[in-house]
Protein backbone atom coordinates (compact mmCIF):
# COMPACT_ATOMS: atom_id res chain seq x y z
CA UNK A 1 0.00 0.00 0.00
CA UNK A 2 1.32 3.42 -0.91
CA UNK A 3 1.01 6.09 1.74
CA UNK A 4 1.69 9.78 1.91
CA UNK A 5 5.24 10.71 2.83
CA UNK A 6 5.26 11.84 6.44
CA UNK A 7 8.51 13.11 7.86
CA UNK A 8 9.85 15.54 10.40
CA UNK A 9 10.24 18.73 8.31
CA UNK A 10 12.72 21.48 8.87
CA UNK A 11 11.59 24.33 11.09
CA UNK A 12 11.73 26.60 8.03
CA UNK A 13 8.75 24.74 6.57
CA UNK A 14 6.54 26.61 9.05
CA UNK A 15 6.47 30.35 8.52
CA UNK A 16 4.83 32.49 11.22
CA UNK A 17 3.27 34.83 8.68
CA UNK A 18 1.39 31.96 7.05
CA UNK A 19 -2.09 31.04 8.20
CA UNK A 20 -1.69 27.81 10.10
CA UNK A 21 -3.84 25.40 12.07
CA UNK A 22 -2.87 22.53 14.31
CA UNK A 23 -4.23 19.04 14.72
CA UNK A 24 -4.89 17.81 18.25
CA UNK A 25 -5.38 14.26 19.46
CA UNK A 26 -6.88 14.72 22.94
CA UNK A 27 -6.42 11.18 24.19
CA UNK A 28 -7.63 9.31 27.23
CA UNK A 29 -4.07 8.45 28.24
CA UNK A 30 -1.87 10.75 26.14
CA UNK A 31 -2.42 13.84 24.01
CA UNK A 32 -0.50 15.09 20.98
CA UNK A 33 -0.42 18.24 18.90
CA UNK A 34 0.95 18.49 15.37
CA UNK A 35 1.13 20.79 12.39
CA UNK A 36 1.34 20.10 8.66
CA UNK A 37 2.86 22.16 5.87
CA UNK A 38 2.95 21.01 2.27
CA UNK A 39 1.50 17.71 3.52
CA UNK A 40 4.51 17.10 5.77
CA UNK A 41 3.71 16.59 9.44
CA UNK A 42 5.58 17.71 12.53
CA UNK A 43 4.54 16.44 15.96
CA UNK A 44 5.31 19.20 18.44
CA UNK A 45 7.24 18.19 21.54
CA UNK A 46 6.69 19.47 25.05
CA UNK A 47 9.28 21.51 26.91
CA UNK A 48 10.71 18.27 28.33
CA UNK A 49 11.07 16.81 24.82
CA UNK A 50 8.01 14.51 24.85
CA UNK A 51 5.69 13.97 21.90
CA UNK A 52 3.18 11.97 23.93
CA UNK A 53 1.96 14.20 26.74
CA UNK A 54 0.08 12.34 29.50
CA UNK A 55 -3.51 13.59 29.70
CA UNK A 56 -3.28 14.29 33.42
CA UNK A 57 -3.84 17.50 35.33
CA UNK A 58 -2.86 18.43 38.85
CA UNK A 59 -3.11 21.63 40.88
CA UNK A 60 -0.29 22.43 43.26
CA UNK A 61 1.16 25.70 44.57
CA UNK A 62 -1.63 27.63 42.85
CA UNK A 63 -0.60 26.33 39.44
CA UNK A 64 -1.93 23.73 37.01
CA UNK A 65 0.55 20.98 36.17
CA UNK A 66 -0.04 18.99 33.00
CA UNK A 67 1.43 15.64 32.06
CA UNK A 68 3.22 14.60 35.25
CA UNK A 69 1.04 11.49 35.73
CA UNK A 70 -0.39 12.90 38.95
CA UNK A 71 -3.77 14.30 39.85
CA UNK A 72 -6.85 13.82 37.68
CA UNK A 73 -6.51 11.20 34.94
CA UNK A 74 -8.58 10.20 31.92
CA UNK A 75 -10.69 13.36 31.95
CA UNK A 76 -11.70 12.49 28.40
CA UNK A 77 -13.99 9.80 29.86
CA UNK A 78 -15.98 12.54 31.61
CA UNK A 79 -16.93 14.51 28.50
CA UNK A 80 -20.71 14.58 28.10
CA UNK A 81 -21.44 12.74 31.34
CA UNK A 82 -24.03 13.84 33.89
CA UNK A 83 -23.60 13.67 37.66
CA UNK A 84 -26.09 10.81 37.75
CA UNK A 85 -24.08 8.84 35.18
CA UNK A 86 -20.90 9.35 37.18
CA UNK A 87 -22.51 8.20 40.42
CA UNK A 88 -24.02 5.13 38.74
CA UNK A 89 -20.87 4.05 36.88
CA UNK A 90 -18.20 2.66 39.24
CA UNK A 91 -15.38 3.01 36.70
CA UNK A 92 -16.14 6.70 36.22
CA UNK A 93 -16.80 7.37 39.90
CA UNK A 94 -13.40 5.94 40.82
CA UNK A 95 -11.75 8.51 38.53
CA UNK A 96 -13.29 11.51 40.27
CA UNK A 97 -14.26 10.37 43.77
CA UNK A 98 -11.56 12.58 45.32
CA UNK A 99 -12.78 15.62 43.40
CA UNK A 100 -16.52 15.15 42.99
CA UNK A 101 -18.91 17.77 44.35
CA UNK A 102 -21.85 15.55 45.26
CA UNK A 103 -23.89 18.50 46.55
CA UNK A 104 -24.11 20.12 43.13
CA UNK A 105 -27.10 19.61 40.83
CA UNK A 106 -24.72 19.16 37.89
CA UNK A 107 -21.34 17.56 37.36
CA UNK A 108 -18.72 19.76 39.01
CA UNK A 109 -15.32 18.90 40.43
CA UNK A 110 -13.55 20.51 43.37
CA UNK A 111 -10.39 21.51 41.59
CA UNK A 112 -7.98 24.42 41.88
CA UNK A 113 -9.85 25.64 44.97
CA UNK A 114 -12.95 26.07 42.83
CA UNK A 115 -15.96 24.12 41.64
CA UNK A 116 -15.22 23.55 37.97
CA UNK A 117 -17.05 21.85 35.13
CA UNK A 118 -15.27 19.25 33.02
CA UNK A 119 -14.71 21.58 30.00
CA UNK A 120 -13.11 24.19 32.26
CA UNK A 121 -10.59 21.65 33.57
CA UNK A 122 -9.95 20.08 30.16
CA UNK A 123 -9.34 23.57 28.78
CA UNK A 124 -6.14 23.73 30.85
CA UNK A 125 -4.77 20.75 28.93
CA UNK A 126 -5.65 22.43 25.63
CA UNK A 127 -3.95 25.61 26.90
CA UNK A 128 -0.83 23.61 27.72
CA UNK A 129 -0.75 22.04 24.25
CA UNK A 130 -1.33 25.45 22.69
CA UNK A 131 1.46 27.08 24.70
CA UNK A 132 3.94 24.31 23.84
CA UNK A 133 3.18 24.66 20.14
CA UNK A 134 3.37 28.46 20.18
CA UNK A 135 6.74 28.29 21.94
CA UNK A 136 8.11 25.86 19.34
CA UNK A 137 6.64 27.61 16.29
CA UNK A 138 7.19 31.17 17.53
CA UNK A 139 3.72 32.26 16.48
CA UNK A 140 0.21 32.55 17.88
CA UNK A 141 -2.15 29.65 17.22
CA UNK A 142 -5.92 30.05 17.11
CA UNK A 143 -7.23 27.33 14.78
CA UNK A 144 -7.40 23.60 15.35
CA UNK A 145 -8.85 20.33 14.12
CA UNK A 146 -9.57 18.09 17.10
CA UNK A 147 -10.19 14.36 17.04
CA UNK A 148 -12.82 12.58 19.13
CA UNK A 149 -13.82 8.92 19.51
CA UNK A 150 -16.20 7.76 16.80
CA UNK A 151 -18.92 7.12 19.37
CA UNK A 152 -18.78 10.49 21.13
CA UNK A 153 -22.31 11.87 21.32
CA UNK A 154 -23.54 15.45 21.01
CA UNK A 155 -22.93 16.02 24.72
CA UNK A 156 -19.30 14.91 24.62
CA UNK A 157 -18.56 16.67 21.32
CA UNK A 158 -20.07 19.88 22.63
CA UNK A 159 -17.91 19.82 25.75
CA UNK A 160 -14.75 19.15 23.73
CA UNK A 161 -15.52 22.18 21.58
CA UNK A 162 -16.23 24.29 24.67
CA UNK A 163 -12.95 23.27 26.32
CA UNK A 164 -11.01 24.16 23.17
CA UNK A 165 -12.85 27.47 22.89
CA UNK A 166 -12.00 28.35 26.50
CA UNK A 167 -8.37 27.62 25.62
CA UNK A 168 -8.51 30.11 22.77
CA UNK A 169 -8.96 27.76 19.83
CA UNK A 170 -11.36 28.14 16.94
CA UNK A 171 -12.35 24.55 16.22
CA UNK A 172 -12.33 24.14 12.46
CA UNK A 173 -13.61 20.59 12.63
CA UNK A 174 -14.15 17.70 15.00
CA UNK A 175 -13.30 14.44 13.25
CA UNK A 176 -13.52 10.85 14.46
CA UNK A 177 -10.20 9.37 15.49
CA UNK A 178 -10.36 6.36 13.11
CA UNK A 179 -11.28 8.73 10.30
CA UNK A 180 -8.26 10.91 11.07
CA UNK A 181 -5.97 7.90 11.03
CA UNK A 182 -7.37 6.78 7.70
CA UNK A 183 -6.82 10.28 6.35
CA UNK A 184 -3.14 9.95 7.22
CA UNK A 185 -2.98 6.62 5.35
CA UNK A 186 -5.23 7.26 2.40
CA UNK A 187 -4.38 10.54 0.72
CA UNK A 188 -2.65 8.95 -2.23
CA UNK A 189 -4.78 9.75 -5.28
CA UNK A 190 -4.74 6.19 -6.52
CA UNK A 191 -5.79 4.72 -3.19
CA UNK A 192 -9.20 3.09 -3.13
CA UNK A 193 -10.88 0.24 -1.35
CA UNK A 194 -12.58 -0.70 1.89
CA UNK A 195 -10.62 -0.74 5.14
CA UNK A 196 -11.19 -1.68 8.75
CA UNK A 197 -9.68 0.88 11.12
CA UNK A 198 -8.75 -0.84 14.39
CA UNK A 199 -8.03 1.77 17.07
CA UNK A 200 -6.99 0.45 20.48
CA UNK A 201 -5.87 3.36 22.60
CA UNK A 202 -5.09 3.59 26.26
CA UNK A 203 -8.68 3.86 27.40
CA UNK A 204 -10.99 3.28 24.46
CA UNK A 205 -11.45 0.92 21.53
CA UNK A 206 -12.97 2.12 18.26
CA UNK A 207 -13.42 0.30 14.98
CA UNK A 208 -14.68 1.74 11.72
CA UNK A 209 -15.32 0.42 8.26
CA UNK A 210 -13.98 2.99 5.85
CA UNK A 211 -14.64 3.21 2.13
CA UNK A 212 -12.11 5.16 0.04
CA UNK A 213 -13.00 6.01 -3.55
CA UNK A 214 -11.54 8.75 -5.74
CA UNK A 215 -10.30 10.81 -2.81
CA UNK A 216 -13.55 10.46 -0.86
CA UNK A 217 -13.33 8.97 2.62
CA UNK A 218 -16.60 7.55 3.90
CA UNK A 219 -17.07 5.78 7.22
CA UNK A 220 -19.90 3.34 6.51
CA UNK A 221 -20.11 1.80 10.00
CA UNK A 222 -18.65 2.26 13.48
CA UNK A 223 -18.50 0.21 16.65
CA UNK A 224 -16.37 0.07 19.77
CA UNK A 225 -16.12 -0.01 23.54
CA UNK A 226 -15.27 3.18 25.41
CA UNK A 227 -14.30 1.24 28.52
CA UNK A 228 -11.73 -1.05 26.87
CA UNK A 229 -8.16 -0.13 26.01
CA UNK A 230 -4.48 -0.75 26.49
CA UNK A 231 -4.86 0.21 30.15
CA UNK A 232 -6.95 -2.94 30.62
CA UNK A 233 -4.05 -5.01 29.28
CA UNK A 234 -1.79 -3.33 31.85
CA UNK A 235 -4.26 -4.18 34.62
CA UNK A 236 -4.40 -7.86 33.60
CA UNK A 237 -0.60 -8.10 33.64
CA UNK A 238 -0.44 -6.25 36.97
CA UNK A 239 -2.89 -8.69 38.54
CA UNK A 240 -0.80 -11.61 37.28
CA UNK A 241 2.39 -10.16 38.76
CA UNK A 242 0.68 -9.47 42.08
CA UNK A 243 -0.63 -13.03 42.32
CA UNK A 244 2.40 -14.83 40.91
CA UNK A 245 5.12 -12.92 42.75
CA UNK A 246 3.20 -11.64 45.78
CA UNK A 247 3.63 -7.99 44.77
CA UNK A 248 1.49 -5.13 46.10
CA UNK A 249 -1.20 -3.74 43.81
CA UNK A 250 0.57 -0.41 43.46
CA UNK A 251 1.67 2.18 40.93
CA UNK A 252 5.15 0.64 40.95
CA UNK A 253 3.74 -2.77 40.02
CA UNK A 254 1.62 -1.18 37.28
CA UNK A 255 4.72 0.51 35.86
CA UNK A 256 6.52 -2.83 35.99
CA UNK A 257 3.64 -4.43 34.06
CA UNK A 258 3.84 -1.72 31.39
CA UNK A 259 7.58 -2.24 31.05
CA UNK A 260 7.05 -5.99 30.68
CA UNK A 261 4.40 -5.47 28.01
CA UNK A 262 6.65 -3.11 26.03
CA UNK A 263 9.65 -5.43 26.29
CA UNK A 264 7.64 -8.43 25.12
CA UNK A 265 6.70 -6.66 21.89
CA UNK A 266 10.23 -7.38 20.63
CA UNK A 267 11.61 -10.02 23.03
CA UNK A 268 10.45 -13.47 24.11
CA UNK A 269 10.93 -12.89 27.83
CA UNK A 270 11.12 -10.17 30.46
CA UNK A 271 13.21 -10.40 33.64
CA UNK A 272 13.46 -7.80 36.36
CA UNK A 273 14.84 -8.56 39.83
CA UNK A 274 12.69 -11.46 41.05
CA UNK A 275 10.00 -11.01 38.39
CA UNK A 276 9.87 -12.83 35.08
CA UNK A 277 7.23 -13.32 32.40
CA UNK A 278 7.51 -14.71 28.88
CA UNK A 279 5.70 -13.84 25.67
CA UNK A 280 3.56 -17.00 25.72
CA UNK A 281 2.24 -16.24 29.22
CA UNK A 282 1.51 -12.65 28.27
CA UNK A 283 -0.47 -13.73 25.23
CA UNK A 284 -2.50 -16.20 27.29
CA UNK A 285 -3.33 -13.42 29.75
CA UNK A 286 -4.48 -10.87 27.21
CA UNK A 287 -6.07 -13.16 24.61
CA UNK A 288 -9.63 -12.72 26.04
CA UNK A 289 -9.31 -8.93 25.71
CA UNK A 290 -7.99 -9.20 22.16
CA UNK A 291 -10.80 -11.60 21.24
CA UNK A 292 -13.33 -9.06 22.56
CA UNK A 293 -11.94 -6.47 20.16
CA UNK A 294 -12.05 -8.93 17.26
CA UNK A 295 -15.71 -9.72 18.00
CA UNK A 296 -16.54 -6.00 18.03
CA UNK A 297 -14.74 -5.59 14.70
CA UNK A 298 -16.71 -8.47 13.18
CA UNK A 299 -19.98 -6.93 14.43
CA UNK A 300 -18.99 -3.67 12.75
CA UNK A 301 -18.41 -5.51 9.47
CA UNK A 302 -21.88 -7.03 9.74
CA UNK A 303 -23.38 -3.57 10.29
CA UNK A 304 -21.67 -2.42 7.10
CA UNK A 305 -23.18 -5.32 5.13
CA UNK A 306 -20.09 -7.56 5.23
CA UNK A 307 -18.12 -5.80 2.48
CA UNK A 308 -14.84 -7.23 1.23
CA UNK A 309 -12.11 -5.35 3.06
CA UNK A 310 -8.68 -4.69 1.59
CA UNK A 311 -6.76 -4.16 4.80
CA UNK A 312 -6.78 -3.38 8.51
CA UNK A 313 -5.31 -0.06 9.65
CA UNK A 314 -3.80 -0.18 13.14
CA UNK A 315 -4.11 2.83 15.42
CA UNK A 316 -3.19 3.28 19.07
CA UNK A 317 -0.08 2.36 21.02
CA UNK A 318 -1.64 -0.86 22.33
CA UNK A 319 -1.64 -2.29 18.79
CA UNK A 320 2.14 -2.77 19.00
CA UNK A 321 1.43 -6.03 20.82
CA UNK A 322 2.24 -8.76 18.24
CA UNK A 323 -0.71 -10.91 19.35
CA UNK A 324 -3.13 -8.28 18.05
CA UNK A 325 -1.69 -8.41 14.54
CA UNK A 326 -1.66 -12.21 14.63
CA UNK A 327 -5.29 -12.50 15.74
CA UNK A 328 -6.47 -9.88 13.24
CA UNK A 329 -4.79 -11.77 10.43
CA UNK A 330 -6.35 -15.05 11.59
CA UNK A 331 -9.78 -13.43 11.67
CA UNK A 332 -9.69 -11.51 8.38
CA UNK A 333 -6.85 -13.03 6.29
CA UNK A 334 -5.86 -9.62 4.93
CA UNK A 335 -2.95 -7.18 5.11
CA UNK A 336 -2.39 -5.51 8.48
CA UNK A 337 -1.23 -1.95 7.83
CA UNK A 338 1.01 -0.42 10.49
CA UNK A 339 3.43 1.73 8.47
CA UNK A 340 2.68 4.81 10.57
CA UNK A 341 3.55 4.99 14.25
CA UNK A 342 0.19 3.94 15.77
CA UNK A 343 0.53 6.53 18.54
CA UNK A 344 0.80 9.32 15.97
CA UNK A 345 -1.53 8.24 13.17
CA UNK A 346 -4.54 10.10 14.59
CA UNK A 347 -2.76 13.39 15.21
CA UNK A 348 -1.09 13.20 11.78
CA UNK A 349 -4.48 12.88 10.17
CA UNK A 350 -5.81 15.79 12.21
CA UNK A 351 -2.85 17.97 11.22
CA UNK A 352 -3.24 17.10 7.54
CA UNK A 353 -6.95 17.86 7.69
CA UNK A 354 -6.21 21.16 9.46
CA UNK A 355 -3.86 22.15 6.66
CA UNK A 356 -6.43 21.10 4.09
CA UNK A 357 -9.11 23.28 5.68
CA UNK A 358 -7.04 26.46 5.76
CA UNK A 359 -5.20 25.90 2.47
CA UNK A 360 -7.23 23.43 0.40
CA UNK A 361 -5.21 21.64 -2.24
CA UNK A 362 -7.04 18.36 -2.49
CA UNK A 363 -10.51 17.08 -3.14
CA UNK A 364 -10.29 14.56 -0.30
CA UNK A 365 -13.43 14.45 1.81
CA UNK A 366 -14.07 12.89 5.23
CA UNK A 367 -17.49 11.51 6.04
CA UNK A 368 -18.51 10.17 9.46
CA UNK A 369 -21.78 8.42 10.31
CA UNK A 370 -24.73 8.85 12.66
CA UNK A 371 -24.39 6.16 15.38
CA UNK A 372 -28.18 5.90 15.94
CA UNK A 373 -31.28 6.70 13.90
CA UNK A 374 -32.93 10.08 14.40
CA UNK A 375 -36.60 10.75 13.89
CA UNK A 376 -39.89 12.14 15.17
CA UNK A 377 -42.87 10.88 17.08
CA UNK A 378 -46.03 10.60 14.99
CA UNK A 379 -49.61 10.39 16.19
CA UNK A 380 -50.08 7.28 18.30
CA UNK A 381 -46.49 7.16 19.52
CA UNK A 382 -45.05 5.75 16.29
CA UNK A 383 -41.51 6.75 15.33
CA UNK A 384 -40.81 8.10 11.86
CA UNK A 385 -37.08 7.62 11.26
CA UNK A 386 -35.64 10.47 9.23
CA UNK A 387 -31.87 9.93 9.44
CA UNK A 388 -31.05 6.25 9.66
CA UNK A 389 -28.43 4.49 11.78
CA UNK A 390 -24.96 4.62 10.13
CA UNK A 391 -26.03 7.27 7.60
CA UNK A 392 -22.94 9.22 6.44
CA UNK A 393 -22.73 12.77 7.79
CA UNK A 394 -22.91 15.70 7.24
CA UNK A 395 -26.45 15.24 5.93
CA UNK A 396 -29.72 17.11 5.62
CA UNK A 397 -33.10 15.42 5.11
CA UNK A 398 -36.42 17.17 4.45
CA UNK A 399 -39.83 15.59 5.07
CA UNK A 400 -43.38 16.90 5.07
CA UNK A 401 -45.87 16.43 7.92
CA UNK A 402 -49.47 17.50 8.34
CA UNK A 403 -52.17 18.08 10.94
CA UNK A 404 -54.29 15.20 12.19
CA UNK A 405 -57.40 16.98 13.45
CA UNK A 406 -59.51 19.89 12.19
CA UNK A 407 -58.64 23.46 13.25
CA UNK A 408 -55.27 22.48 14.65
CA UNK A 409 -53.27 25.69 15.20
CA UNK A 410 -50.04 24.10 16.38
CA UNK A 411 -47.90 21.03 15.74
CA UNK A 412 -45.85 19.41 18.49
CA UNK A 413 -42.51 18.00 17.40
CA UNK A 414 -40.81 15.35 19.52
CA UNK A 415 -37.28 14.53 18.35
CA UNK A 416 -36.11 10.99 19.09
CA UNK A 417 -32.97 8.89 18.84
CA UNK A 418 -32.93 5.11 18.61
CA UNK A 419 -33.81 2.04 16.59
CA UNK A 420 -37.11 1.00 18.17
CA UNK A 421 -40.48 1.50 16.45
CA UNK A 422 -42.31 3.26 19.29
CA UNK A 423 -41.42 6.59 20.90
CA UNK A 424 -41.65 5.17 24.41
CA UNK A 425 -38.71 2.87 23.62
CA UNK A 426 -36.46 5.56 22.11
CA UNK A 427 -34.36 8.33 23.63
CA UNK A 428 -36.01 11.75 23.79
CA UNK A 429 -33.70 14.49 22.49
CA UNK A 430 -35.89 17.58 22.30
CA UNK A 431 -39.41 18.96 21.91
CA UNK A 432 -40.71 22.11 20.29
CA UNK A 433 -43.97 23.46 18.89
CA UNK A 434 -44.80 25.21 15.63
CA UNK A 435 -47.49 27.69 16.68
CA UNK A 436 -49.78 30.17 14.96
CA UNK A 437 -51.01 27.90 12.18
CA UNK A 438 -54.28 28.87 10.43
CA UNK A 439 -57.27 26.76 11.59
CA UNK A 440 -58.06 24.44 8.69
CA UNK A 441 -59.35 20.96 8.02
CA UNK A 442 -57.07 18.06 8.95
CA UNK A 443 -54.49 17.32 6.28
CA UNK A 444 -54.48 20.81 4.76
CA UNK A 445 -51.56 22.23 6.71
CA UNK A 446 -48.18 21.06 5.44
CA UNK A 447 -45.10 21.53 7.64
CA UNK A 448 -41.71 21.06 6.03
CA UNK A 449 -39.31 19.56 8.58
CA UNK A 450 -35.53 19.52 8.05
CA UNK A 451 -33.15 17.32 10.02
CA UNK A 452 -29.48 18.33 9.63
CA UNK A 453 -26.33 16.89 11.13
CA UNK A 454 -23.22 18.98 10.55
CA UNK A 455 -19.66 17.78 10.16
CA UNK A 456 -19.19 17.86 13.94
CA UNK A 457 -22.15 15.55 14.52
CA UNK A 458 -24.42 18.24 15.99
CA UNK A 459 -28.13 17.84 15.17
CA UNK A 460 -30.42 20.75 14.31
CA UNK A 461 -34.11 20.50 13.41
CA UNK A 462 -36.25 23.15 11.74
CA UNK A 463 -39.91 23.28 10.72
CA UNK A 464 -41.61 25.62 8.23
CA UNK A 465 -45.28 26.06 7.32
CA UNK A 466 -45.84 27.88 4.03
CA UNK A 467 -49.40 29.21 4.40
CA UNK A 468 -48.73 31.09 7.64
CA UNK A 469 -45.02 31.59 6.89
CA UNK A 470 -44.32 30.20 10.36
CA UNK A 471 -41.01 28.60 11.26
CA UNK A 472 -39.14 27.27 14.25
CA UNK A 473 -35.68 25.80 14.67
CA UNK A 474 -33.88 24.03 17.47
CA UNK A 475 -30.35 22.75 17.99
CA UNK A 476 -30.15 19.67 20.15
CA UNK A 477 -28.20 20.66 23.26
CA UNK A 478 -25.29 18.56 24.50
CA UNK A 479 -27.11 17.30 27.61
CA UNK A 480 -29.48 15.41 25.33
CA UNK A 481 -26.72 13.08 24.11
CA UNK A 482 -26.09 9.45 25.02
CA UNK A 483 -22.88 7.56 25.60
CA UNK A 484 -21.40 4.53 23.85
CA UNK A 485 -22.69 2.06 26.45
CA UNK A 486 -26.25 3.27 25.91
CA UNK A 487 -25.80 3.07 22.14
CA UNK A 488 -24.78 -0.57 22.44
CA UNK A 489 -27.72 -1.35 24.72
CA UNK A 490 -30.19 0.39 22.39
CA UNK A 491 -28.89 -1.45 19.34
CA UNK A 492 -29.01 -4.76 21.18
CA UNK A 493 -32.56 -4.12 22.44
CA UNK A 494 -33.68 -3.14 18.94
CA UNK A 495 -32.32 -6.42 17.60
CA UNK A 496 -33.88 -8.52 20.35
CA UNK A 497 -37.27 -6.82 20.08
CA UNK A 498 -37.40 -6.41 16.29
CA UNK A 499 -40.30 -8.81 15.77
CA UNK A 500 -42.49 -7.55 18.61
CA UNK A 501 -41.66 -3.94 17.70
CA UNK A 502 -42.76 -4.58 14.14
CA UNK A 503 -46.11 -6.07 15.16
CA UNK A 504 -46.63 -3.31 17.73
CA UNK A 505 -46.10 -0.70 15.03
CA UNK A 506 -48.43 -2.50 12.61
CA UNK A 507 -51.12 -2.63 15.31
CA UNK A 508 -50.75 1.05 16.18
CA UNK A 509 -50.85 2.08 12.52
CA UNK A 510 -53.97 -0.05 12.01
CA UNK A 511 -55.66 1.49 15.07
CA UNK A 512 -54.85 5.02 13.89
CA UNK A 513 -56.18 4.28 10.41
CA UNK A 514 -59.31 2.70 11.87
CA UNK A 515 -59.99 5.66 14.16
CA UNK A 516 -59.61 8.09 11.27
CA UNK A 517 -61.80 5.88 9.09
CA UNK A 518 -64.56 5.66 11.72
CA UNK A 519 -64.43 9.44 12.30
CA UNK A 520 -64.75 10.19 8.58
CA UNK A 521 -67.66 7.79 8.04
CA UNK A 522 -69.60 8.97 11.09
CA UNK A 523 -69.09 12.58 10.03
CA UNK A 524 -70.35 11.77 6.54
CA UNK A 525 -73.45 10.04 7.93
CA UNK A 526 -74.22 13.06 10.13
CA UNK A 527 -73.86 15.55 7.28
CA UNK A 528 -75.46 13.51 4.48
CA UNK A 529 -78.20 11.57 6.24
CA UNK A 530 -80.72 12.54 3.55
CA UNK A 531 -78.77 10.58 0.94
CA UNK A 532 -79.17 7.33 2.87
CA UNK A 533 -82.06 5.03 3.68
CA UNK A 534 -82.51 3.54 7.14
CA UNK A 535 -81.37 0.14 5.88
CA UNK A 536 -78.21 1.66 4.40
CA UNK A 537 -77.43 3.46 7.68
CA UNK A 538 -78.00 0.17 9.50
CA UNK A 539 -75.52 -1.61 7.18
CA UNK A 540 -72.95 1.13 7.67
CA UNK A 541 -73.27 1.07 11.47
CA UNK A 542 -73.00 -2.72 11.52
CA UNK A 543 -69.81 -2.60 9.47
CA UNK A 544 -68.43 0.18 11.67
CA UNK A 545 -69.15 -1.94 14.74
CA UNK A 546 -67.04 -4.71 13.22
CA UNK A 547 -64.13 -2.28 12.88
CA UNK A 548 -64.59 -1.02 16.46
CA UNK A 549 -64.62 -4.58 17.79
CA UNK A 550 -61.41 -5.34 15.90
CA UNK A 551 -59.79 -2.24 17.42
CA UNK A 552 -60.93 -3.33 20.87
CA UNK A 553 -59.46 -6.79 20.23
CA UNK A 554 -56.07 -5.19 19.36
CA UNK A 555 -55.76 -7.39 16.27
CA UNK A 556 -54.17 -5.49 13.38
CA UNK A 557 -55.00 -8.16 10.80
CA UNK A 558 -58.66 -8.14 11.87
CA UNK A 559 -58.72 -4.34 11.78
CA UNK A 560 -57.37 -4.20 8.22
CA UNK A 561 -59.76 -6.93 7.06
CA UNK A 562 -62.73 -5.13 8.66
CA UNK A 563 -61.88 -1.91 6.82
CA UNK A 564 -61.53 -3.82 3.53
CA UNK A 565 -64.89 -5.49 4.16
CA UNK A 566 -66.51 -2.09 4.78
CA UNK A 567 -65.16 -0.60 1.54
CA UNK A 568 -66.17 -3.65 -0.49
CA UNK A 569 -69.76 -3.85 0.79
CA UNK A 570 -70.35 -0.09 0.66
CA UNK A 571 -69.18 0.00 -2.95
CA UNK A 572 -71.68 -2.72 -3.89
CA UNK A 573 -74.73 -1.55 -1.95
CA UNK A 574 -74.58 2.22 -1.46
CA UNK A 575 -75.86 5.04 -3.61
CA UNK A 576 -73.30 6.29 -6.13
CA UNK A 577 -73.37 9.81 -4.70
CA UNK A 578 -72.60 8.57 -1.20
CA UNK A 579 -69.82 6.38 -2.55
CA UNK A 580 -68.19 9.45 -4.08
CA UNK A 581 -68.43 11.24 -0.73
CA UNK A 582 -66.89 8.31 1.14
CA UNK A 583 -64.06 7.90 -1.37
CA UNK A 584 -63.21 11.60 -1.26
CA UNK A 585 -63.26 11.65 2.53
CA UNK A 586 -60.90 8.70 2.69
CA UNK A 587 -58.53 10.48 0.32
CA UNK A 588 -58.32 13.39 2.77
CA UNK A 589 -60.57 15.84 0.87
CA UNK A 590 -62.71 18.45 2.54
CA UNK A 591 -66.47 17.72 2.51
CA UNK A 592 -67.08 21.27 1.28
CA UNK A 593 -65.12 20.46 -1.89
CA UNK A 594 -67.46 17.64 -2.85
CA UNK A 595 -70.01 18.76 -5.44
Swiss-Prot record:
Disulphide-bonded residues: none
Gene Ontology molecular function terms on file: ATP binding; ATP hydrolysis activity; ATP-dependent protein folding chaperone; unfolded protein binding
BP-aspect Gene Ontology terms: iron-sulfur cluster assembly
Protein keywords: ATP-binding, Chaperone, Nucleotide-binding
Alphabetical list of Pfam families matching this protein: HSP70 (PF00012)
Taxonomic superkingdom: Bacteria
InterPro entries to which the protein is assigned, alphabetical: ATPase_NBD, Heat_shock_70_CS, HSP70_C_sf, HSP70_peptide-bd_sf, Hsp_70_fam, ISC_FeS_clus_asmbl_HscA
Gene3D superfamilies tied to this protein: 1.20.1270.10, 3.30.420.40, Actin, Chain A, domain 4, Substrate Binding Domain Of DNAk, Chain A, domain 1
PANTHER family: HEAT SHOCK PROTEIN 70KDA (PTHR19375)
Function noted in UniProt: Chaperone involved in the maturation of iron-sulfur cluster-containing proteins. Has a low intrinsic ATPase activity which is markedly stimulated by HscB.
NCBIfam families recorded: PRK01433.1
UniProt record similarity statement: Belongs to the heat shock protein 70 family.
Official protein name in the record: Chaperone protein HscA homolog
Species this protein is from: Rickettsia rickettsii (strain Sheila Smith)
Species classification: Bacteria, Pseudomonadati, Pseudomonadota, Alphaproteobacteria, Rickettsiales
